[in-house]
Amino acid sequence: MVKDGAVVDRGVNLAAEYCERLDLAILVSGLGLEVAALVFDMVASGKALHIWSMGDLLHDAIAFLKVCLLDGIVPLLDMDAECELAQVIFNTGLPLHNRLRTLLESALAATNSVPAITAQHALCEEDIVPLVYASMSVMFCSTTLLSNGVDSNLFESIRRSSQALLRSVFELHADQRTWILEEILASLVKLPAQKRAQSVHRVAGGKSV
């Protein structure tokens, strides 16, 4: 019993340490997304034109948005609800959930700011590629974690914003359309059968993919 008790205590300590690190990672990512959204707004409004390194700032902001979505938020939300890490997150209660909600709000602000840039500035391929993959990762995210207490409506807003961003890139960059379509179709094929049903993925005009 003493041994079992020690194992339980160690598990509790590891869970607490994991949540502390996750909380810090979410906090830092949220701050980074706020900075990225600020850069996008400055570029869209023309306020950053006097900054000699505007191109580098924009590139770094796009790269950070891609990393946060593709390598951070989406894998976290796609986590199997039955896995141990997901259970740890569920059991932490409001503090971590509120932090995650704030992160999603920052991600929404950032994704909402990008289409204005794509409409006004000719982006290079180095910036288009991460934007496309970031948008697609959100579009095809299963959001398993959100169905267990975290605000799913907020992520749906991010999904719609990402679809608008991808549509903007697709319309404005004809030379990129072929590979974008190939990646979208490849992602659709990989989806479970129930998620390939009509009405799940819609395009402009109300038609289904």
Language model features with spans:
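Eukaryotic alpha-helical solenoid repeat scaffolds
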Residues: M1-V209
